[in-house]
């Protein structure tokens, strides 16, 4: 370990990419996962096209810079957690490494993350990019859910370090409920929910559009996003919450002030019901999506009930939140309450059906919140990549040259025993 440079940890999500060095408590950069490229439709001869292609390959921006370039085409290479455009992803990684991390890839091991149910072929593509294009000495591709479980060890609620638990990973583009037993994902039981951060933003945008006329149309989405991040919370009871706002509006209704990008004048809007109705679509999805009506607590319950019977209790006991969309105030508390109701009702029913002969042992339902939730996956990666074990399980350049990209199809679990 001595004298070795720290590993680079890169967590690419649908909306944001988190990057930094292992051993740190938070990522050095959090940038939008987008890339701005020049799309030219000029008709030129062969020789000129060759010159232009070389120049165009270098003429691109990523992250916040990409969003600010109106003359470029902005692309998002990752959709619903899975990489869709590998050429763009390679260029994206190029700037991540050289411009942001300012690292020499030959000197650092890399830990990259992957969504649940990622295909082995995708792991091979990742390995090819990292070993062929960037010549890295070692690569480990970690499952996001396992890293999120490791990150939850920082919580005071966690007594012992375990890699068994249910991870609710809700980012910008997708929400997954992933059961993990001893560090291995139970793939057949994963469920995904078509509601995530972006859907909440769209829903708030729609609510604001119906009521507030002063928002410039081209800024309505970013206004909705700011309202969501600044003011939203999860309420325990919808009807009571509506009554609160109706009886004592001045206490609950907030003001948001934005600046019109074109006229540079200020505009102010009132933020009322949107504060709690936004995140409420996790618990009442039919508000935003008529095709999907299953609340998140029922999805979690169904996932755990589909798992092998001997891991169900530990899965209920260790429900870990991860990702930016779980950051709403009281999200964990509401989820725990709803889930406990479902579980207790089932136990009560089984007792009644047995005519009182069965006395089921109560099930301990615990939803774990911790201060690393937003970057849980990155932070879990940072913790695990700073252990000596990490370097033993990494796939090295030597292995890659001997065997080929197929070595990255399987990445052994580690960090459980320590």
From Swiss-Prot:
SUPFAM superfamilies: Actin-like ATPase domain
Originating organism: Gallus gallus
Domain of life of the native organism: Eukaryota
Annotated function: ATP-binding component of the Arp2/3 complex, a multiprotein complex that mediates actin polymerization upon stimulation by nucleation-promoting factor (NPF). The Arp2/3 complex mediates the formation of branched actin networks in the cytoplasm, providing the force for cell motility. Seems to contact the pointed end of the daughter actin filament. In addition to its role in the cytoplasmic cytoskeleton, the Arp2/3 complex also promotes actin polymerization in the nucleus, thereby regulating gene transcription and repair of damaged DNA.
Subunit structure: Component of the Arp2/3 complex composed of ACTR2/ARP2, ACTR3/ARP3, ARPC1B/p41-ARC, ARPC2/p34-ARC, ARPC3/p21-ARC, ARPC4/p20-ARC and ARPC5/p16-ARC.
A Pfam family of this chain: Actin
Coiled-coil ranges (or none): none
Record's protein name: Actin-related protein 3
InterPro entries found in the cross-reference section: Actin, Actin/actin-like_CS, ATPase_NBD
Cell location: Cytoplasm, Cytoskeleton; Cell projection; Nucleus
PROSITE patterns reported for this sequence: ACTINS_ACT_LIKE (PS01132)
Location, primary (coarse class): cytoplasm
Tissues where this protein is expressed: Detected in fibroblasts.
Residue numbers carrying N-acetylalanine: 2
């Amino acid at each position: 370990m001595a004298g070795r440079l720290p590993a680079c940890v890169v967590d690419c999500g649908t909306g944001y990419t988190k990057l930094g060095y292992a051993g740190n408590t938070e990522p050095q950069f959090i940038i939008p996962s987008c890339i701005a490229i020049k799309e030219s439709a000029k008709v030129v001869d062969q020789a000129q096209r060759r010159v232009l292609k070389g120049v165009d390959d270098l003429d691109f921006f990523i992250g916040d810079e990409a969003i600010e370039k109106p003359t470029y085409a902005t692309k998002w290479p990752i959709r619903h957690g899975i990489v869709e455009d590998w050429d763009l992803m390679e260029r994206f990684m190029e700037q991540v490494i050289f411009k942001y991390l300012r690292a020499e890839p030959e000197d650092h091991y890399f830990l990259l993350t992957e969504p649940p149910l990622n295909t082995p072929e995708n792991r091979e593509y990742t390995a090819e990019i990292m070993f062929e294009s960037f010549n890295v000495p070692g690569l480990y591709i970690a499952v996001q859910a396992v890293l999120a479980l490791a990150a939850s060890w920082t919580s005071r609620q966690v007594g012992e370090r375990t890699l068994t638990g249910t991870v609710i990973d809700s980012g910008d583009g997708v929400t997954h409920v992933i059961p993990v037993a001893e560090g291995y994902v139970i793939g057949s039981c994963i469920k995904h929910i078509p509601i995530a951060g972006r859907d909440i933003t769209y829903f708030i945008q729609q609510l604001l559009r119906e009521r507030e006329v002063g928002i410039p149309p081209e800024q309505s989405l970013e206004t909705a996003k700011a309202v969501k991040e600044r003011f939203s919370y999860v309420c325990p009871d919808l009807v009571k919450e509506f009554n609160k706002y109706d009886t004592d509006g001045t206490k609950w209704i907030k003001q948001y002030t934005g600046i019109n990008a074109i006229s540079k004048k200020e505009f102010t809007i009132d933020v009322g019901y949107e504060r709690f109705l936004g995140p409420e679509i996790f618990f009442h999805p039919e508000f935003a999506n008529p095709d999907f009506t299953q609340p998140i607590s029922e999805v979690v319950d169904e996932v755990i009930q589909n798992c092998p019977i001997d891991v169900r209790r530990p899965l209920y006991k260790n429900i870990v939140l991860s990702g930016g969309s779980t950051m709403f105030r009281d999200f964990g508390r509401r989820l725990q309450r709803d889930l406990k109701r479902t579980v207790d009702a089932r136990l009560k029913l089984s007792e009644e059906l047995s005519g009182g002969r069965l006395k089921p042992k109560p099930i301990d339902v615990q939803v774990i919140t911790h201060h690393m939730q937003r970057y849980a996956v990155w932070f879990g990666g940072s913790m695990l990549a700073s252990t000596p074990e990490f370097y033993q399980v990494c796939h090295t350049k030597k292995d890659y040259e001997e065997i080929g990209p197929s070595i990255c199809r399987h990445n052994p679990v580690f960090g459980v025993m320590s």
